[in-house]
Each structure stands twice: as C-alpha cells, then as structure tokens.
C-alpha cells in the first residue's frame, strides 16, 4: 500500500507502508 509520504533520501522515493 503506497502512502502519501516521501523518504528524506535523494532522489526522493515514495515510502511504502503495510
């Protein structure tokens, strides 16, 4: 499930949460 949040890495990647 893709949450509407982003990692603080570069390039920014979508973070996944179950």
Curated annotation (Swiss-Prot):
Major site of localization recorded for this protein: secreted
Keywords associated with the record: Amidation, Cleavage on pair of basic residues, Disulfide bond, Inflammatory response, Mast cell degranulation, Secreted
Disulfide bonds: 5-15
A GO CC annotation given for this chain: extracellular region
Annotated localization: Secreted
GO biological process, one term: inflammatory response
Tissue specificity: Expressed by the skin glands.
Arginine amide modification, residue list: 18
Highest taxon, organism lineage: Eukaryota
Entry function: Mast cell degranulating peptide. Inhibits granulopoiesis in human bone marrow in vitro. Causes histamine release from rat peritoneal mast cells in vitro. Does not induce apoptosis of human neutrophils in vitro.
Family that this chain belongs to: Belongs to the frog skin active peptide (FSAP) family. Brevinin subfamily.
Protein name from the UniProt record: Peptide tyrosine arginine
